[in-house]
Amino acid sequence: MKNLLLFTLFIFTLFSCEKDQNLPAPYYSIEGKWLIEGMIPDGNTMYLYEDGLRYTYYCVEGDCEALYNSYEANDGNHIPGPLNYTYENDILTVDLNFGNELVTPITFECDGGEAIFETPGYSLFRLNSGCN
């Protein structure tokens, strides 16, 4: 009787488990601090996307990473005039002013640490992601 009960429990457990083959794709946000790779000194431009505004920061010497880590949105260290942006359905739209816009599909790699801009064809790397 005990063996029958264990066998029944085993069969019930075996057939009640479903394989979840269709896991949803991870969602990555553009919000945060992003560096342009290949600038001299390396990473001398940082974009900070937050609450629909893109702030631009520059670093010309010293420890740029430590400097960028200390910056916060609208802290006065950015260049004047943050730009408006939207990010919906994997499409980034940045209002570059004077009728100009950057509209590009974005794909993410490196667990969200690299944002690949389809047009104009470059990548941004999330600050402190180690993806460069």
Describe the function of each predicted region.
Residues G52-R54:
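Structural signal for glycine-centered tight turns and loop->strand junctions in beta-sheet-rich domains
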Residues G121-N132:
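Short, low-complexity, Pro/Ser/Thr/Gly-rich segments in the mature regions of secreted, periplasmic
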Residues P26-T45, L83:
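Tryptophan-anchored aromatic micro-motifs
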Residues L14-W34, N132:
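Bacterial Sec-dependent N-terminal signal peptides
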Residues M39-P41, Y58-G121:
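Contiguous, well-ordered beta-strand patches that form the walls/edges
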Residues M1-S16:
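Sec-dependent bacterial lipoprotein signal peptides
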